[in-house]
Curated annotation (Swiss-Prot):
The gene is pyrC. The active site is at 310. This is Dihydroorotase. Substrate binds at residues 65-67, 97, 283, 314. Its cofactor is Zn(2+). The keyword Manganese does not apply. Pathway: Pyrimidine metabolism; UMP biosynthesis via de novo pathway; (S)-dihydroorotate from bicarbonate: step 3/3. NCBIfam families: pyrC_multi (TIGR00857). Zn(2+) 2 binds at residues 155, 182, 235.
């Protein structure tokens, strides 16, 4: 039998190549060999019937927490990669807030080795901005880049020192690395646990004002202007942050941004409606309806470059506690497409823009070899059933985490097949390879 794979009959949506229509995708030797309306194929060729499906570049997630090393009870590189391909993601960027923190080559190399052993999604490590993510001394950026890191972050913690952030932008620029930053002023956050507003008041919970994010975004944009370093704002959640990024781009500054599905779909009123469910607790918190509207508009008009999940698995021990004491974060790799397809159905996004924000957009931000079905590109492909509807059963998730606000909800759209390097690594209804 031929080792060539023909994906036939599907609607190919490849924003990077300007393609949107029924095409055949030909994969040979792990690469995209051809995308065309008519293709002659051998009788013994392998065929994937994609009729009534979307065929897109594999999704790229700039922001996941794989927890390994040190917190394997929450997630491992292997289980996180399995969750990724189940959701259509063929490449994920692993945040450095592991134990120990990924601030050196040894941790980076361990993550890469675990990813290679899993043989599922491609994993791109993100190194720490500061040693131990302590915010006091810069990590060794040259060592981190040489060992395989594609960006730098102290995610989970802001860089509170403006002087250190300035030096980080300067140092990272010398190595061609972007900083992907968690923006919050801890002095304004205080002991807040959800968005500051009427919902927090009704629940009797301490609030976090939107300005805690806004002031840090504005500070770091000013430092970009000073240094010329590249800034990527992680999990944007406020209207003020969207405005600041839009203005920075208008001025030609190297500033990009991402937004999560939950910050596009849920508000602080959902926290109240949940009855203190800790599946609705994350950082940044779910914001107001006005903030959600601004984030949707920012994604639609390109102010925000990418959809990123901030996939953050936790154990029941860390979530099944009082709201104030619960860990922040939810799992998102297996629900991202479905949640965001809901935005398309609401008219907030076009189908093309949704695919672009999951593929070419994030690939451009970190300069990754992904997000395209161009001839010669790695054959990383997602096949999607946009008409499917399903009910989320946490017990059926591939991730170790069960912390999701969409438990028991009806969702639209499923990934039926995921291909990495020409290999089918996920097929709906079958165990992943």
């Amino acid at each position: 039998m031929s080792d060539v794979l023909f994906i036939e009959g599907g609607r190919v949506i490849d924003p990077a190549g300007g393609v949107d229509g029924v095409r055949t995708v030909v994969i040979r030797d792990g690469k995209v060999a051809e995308v065309a309306e008519r293709v002659e194929r051998p009788r013994d060729a392998r065929v994937l019937d994609a009729r009534n499906r979307w065929v897109t570049p594999g999704f790229v997630d700039l922001h996941v927490h794989l927890r390994e090393p040190g917190q394997e009870y929450k997630e491992t590189v292997a289980t996180g990669a399995r969750a990724a391909v189940a959701g259509g993601f063929t490449a994920v960027c692993a945040m450095p807030n592991t134990k120990p923190v990924n601030d050196c080559a040894a941790v980076t190399e361990l993550v890469l080795a675990r990813a290679a052993a899993a043989g599922l999604a491609r994993v791109y490590p993100v190194g720490a901005i500061s040693k131990g993510s302590g915010g006091e001394e810069l990590a060794e950026y040259g060592e981190l880049k040489a060992s395989g890191c594609v960006a730098l972050s102290d995610d989970g913690r802001p860089v509170m020192s403006s002087a250190l952030m300035r030096r980080a932008l300067e140092y990272a620029r010398a190595f061609g690395l972007p900083l992907t930053v968690h923006e919050e002023d801890l002095h304004l956050v205080g002991k807040g646990v959800m968005h500051e507003g009427a919902a927090a008041t009704r629940l009797g919970l301490k609030g976090i004002p939107s300005q805690a994010e806004d002031v840090m975004v504005l500070r770091d944009i000013a430092l970009v202007e000073l240094t010329g370093g590249r800034l990527h704002v992680a999990h944007v959640s406020t209207a003020g942050a969207v405005r600041a990024i839009r203005e920075a781009k208008r001025r030609g500054l190297p500033v990009t941004g991402e937004v999560t599905p939950h910050h596009l779909a849920l508000t602080d009123d959902d926290v109240a409606a949940s009855g203190y469910s800790t599946d609705f607790k994350m950082n940044p918190p779910l914001r107001s309806a006005d903030d959600v509207r601004a984030c949707r508009e920012g994604l639609a008009d390109g102010t925000l470059d990418a959809i990123a999940t901030d996939h953050a698995p936790h154990s029941a021990v860390e979530k099944d506690v009082e709201f104030d004491a619960a860990a922040n974060g939810i799992v998102g790799l297996e629900t991202a497409f479905s949640v965001c397809l809901g935005l398309v159905r609401e008219g907030a996004l076009t189908e093309r823009r949704l695919v672009e924000a999951l593929t070419a957009g994030p690939a451009r931000v970190f300069g990754l070899p992904a997000g395209t079905l161009a001839r010669g590109a790695a054959a990383d492909v997602a096949v999607l059933d946009a008409a499917a509807e399903w009910t989320l059963d946490p017990a059926r998730l591939q991730s170790k985490g069960r912390n999701t606000p969409w438990k028991g909800r009806r969702l639209a759209g499923r990934c039926t097949h995921t291909i990495v390097g020409g290999r089918i690594v996920h097929e709906e209804g079958k165990a992943d390879r």
